């Protein structure tokens, strides 16, 4: 099993939910987060707008993101990544990131089921 941690633009959330529904993903955890990448959260065209909204200059501007966390079977990882990239890539800075982690086990608290059955 793998955990996919996807940091995406908020407006792409419905697309991600649709992708996960198509593969019958058992569930997901969503969080509203703020962050920045190597561009420190601002592209050249965004800098004036962000600074105007903040009312002061900052050295690092954090942008709103949605963090989507899912645990899936290994076989589903590459199809999900491919579909997420197809739907979420805008060719602009700030499209997000996907992190992949190994999951040793999963346990459904209510029933005690383990592994894939717990998803």
Where are these regions (language model features)?
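Positively charged, small/polar-rich N-terminal and surface patches that mediate targeting and assembly
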Residues: 1-119
């Amino acid at each position: 099993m793998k955990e996919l941690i996807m940091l995406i633009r908020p407006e792409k959330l419905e697309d991600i939910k649709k992708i996960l529904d198509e593969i019958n993903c058992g569930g997901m955890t969503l969080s509203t987060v703020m962050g920045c990448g190597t561009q420190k959260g601002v592209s050249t065209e965004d800098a004036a707008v962000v600074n105007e909204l903040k009312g002061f200059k900052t050295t690092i501007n954090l942008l709103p993101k949605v963090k989507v966390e899912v645990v899936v079977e290994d076989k589903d990882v590459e199809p999900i990544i491919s579909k997420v990239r197809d739907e979420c890539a805008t060719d602009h800075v700030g499209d997000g990131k996907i992190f992949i982690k190994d999951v040793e086990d999963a346990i459904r608290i209510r029933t005690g089921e383990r592994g894939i059955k717990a998803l």
